[in-house]
Amino acid sequence: ASDVYKRQMRGRPITVAALCSDILAKTLERCLIKSEILGFTTKAWKGGNSREKWIKNGKPSNPGRLNDLRHIIYKSADSPWRRSKKNLGLLLKEGILKENVDGEALSWAYNRLSFRKEKRKILIVISDGAPVDDSTLSVNPGNYLEKNLRDIIGEIEKKDEIELIAIGIGHDVSRYYSKAVTIMDVDQLGEVLLNQLSATFHLDN
């Protein structure tokens, strides 16, 4: 199992998400199931080095992503829970969470999971909004990041090698993902996470 975080969650939502993933990782480890907890954001608010390089090159049209990505491994699959639990404190660190480029983060998480030797692989996405990066969207079509996300989801679901599940917090993720659950209250997250995993394992049996 692998959890993927989203940039926009702040305050209570990100705190609850961190606690839920911490408990889930500990529980799965006791069941001898390996898990990863991953996160993603950008290094800067206004594009960083990517945008500066684009400007120096004369601002060519349709440049694609114009921000520097930051992908974070809070817990790797082979790292024991006790060694990784302190890393989740990074989620609460002021200033670390900025913009969010969902598609490339999902592709990164998928690629990490695809290299694993386990027979059963589940990728869980926790999301609270559509992809947003002002630097990128200001010089590309308005649906650029959303289209990228849809394309990557489509590729993953078509391959059917990894089970992809999305949980939306106040955000309808069913318009992106085939297997999706939307909750309106972040306090429901822990229960929904466990229910989704239980249902998935039950179907396997």
Describe the residue ranges of each PLM region.
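Short, small-residue-biased leader/transition segments that mark boundaries at the very start
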Residues: A1-Y5
